Amino acid sequence: EICACLVGSEMCIRDSYKEMLNLPDDETQADMYLAAVEALRSRGFRQYEISNFARKGLYSRHNMKYWTGGEYLGFGPSASSDFAGKRFTLKRDLQEYIAGIRDGGDIMEDLQEIPMRERAGEYLMLRLRTSQGISAAEYEKLFLLPFAPLEDVLEKRRRYYQATQNDSGRWVLTPQGYLVSNDIITDLLIAQDSSHPLKRI
């Protein structure tokens, strides 16, 4: 992994966290994270995403667009977009991009149609990063996949205080759950991959 650090007025890049001196062990980092969550909560900041906190109404709308699977358009060389079920990137080379615009040519460099099951996986991975969480009805309506296998995984995690349902019945991860979110999401994706599509009514 790459770790960026400020040294004086210059930015340096370190090749690995291991090069940092006195990095706390995993257990200490977890304790520090939970302490930070509680300290921010006691001062009126809500945790609306795994690593983001804000006062009510001041959430990052830009980031929420990505985390909730919203469509977005990017403009200019190398810009990325996700629109109408397709994900695409515009040409990176400035001259090729300008020529494409000027001459009415192709300015796309990469175009992908994302399979529905992959979108469903992204829904789980991204929504569970947020305090909005995931909904059985929403999941089944959007992706025509059964939620029951996922609920089994989440119920097991509830026993360890890592997942819960909010007042709206949506499944969300707890601060303890965020600490092991990669494991939880992996279990959910495995359950999803073995499920069979629902029949259209």
Positions of PLM-derived features:
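Accessory beta->alpha helical hairpin/"wing" motif in late/C-terminal subdomains of nucleic-acid enzymes
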Residues: 166-184
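A short, conserved structural fragment
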Residues: 158-168
